[in-house]
Amino acid sequence: MPNNQNRDNFIDKAFTVIAESIVKIMPIADKEKKAYIYYRDGLAAQNNGDYSEALDYYNESLLLEENKIDRGETLKNMAIIYMSNGEEDRSIETYQKALEENPKQPSCLKNIGLIYEKRGRFAEQNGDLDQRDMWFDKAAQVWSKAVRLYPGGYLDIENWLKTSGRSSIDIYL
């Protein structure tokens, strides 16, 4: 295990050095460079489990970043942190903001669906079948969109949609 960790640390460090070199020579505005640096530092903090620090960096990046795709990616990473921290409602809101910035992020839809499906399973365990069906239907709705954006990328979700009877034939076209 230590060898894998050393290799991963080496790869992370090498990537950081290469990325910094590219950012320095790229003909982009200082504001965009700073946004990227905050994003990169947020990613590093997130990978190290320093979620509070990562959120600080991501928020700084969002203040500077104008590119919608990059903003969407930053928001998606923030939503992942909220999800990891058990802040499901905040995570959903942040995923939705990410999708407003960049609607072509199937992983955001997938993760929203995971939260809905989890809530459905919880309702089922508590014997509330109406709530279960509501949450499962919501999961199916967002997962269907994810599968359309990334066909074949979420086979487990496609299987769930089929076996739960919540798929529509056009998902697979």
Curated annotation (Swiss-Prot):
Gene3D superfamilies: Tetratricopeptide repeat domain. The keyword Transmembrane does not apply. It comes from the Bacteria. One of its GO terms (biological process) is photosynthesis. It is a peripheral membrane protein. TPR repeats lie at residues 35-68, 72-105, 120-153. Keywords: Membrane, Photosynthesis, Repeat, Thylakoid, TPR repeat. Essential for the assembly of the photosystem I (PSI) complex. May act as a chaperone-like factor to guide the assembly of the PSI subunits. This is Photosystem I assembly protein Ycf3. It comes from Prochlorococcus marinus subsp. pastoris (strain CCMP1986 / NIES-2087 / MED4).
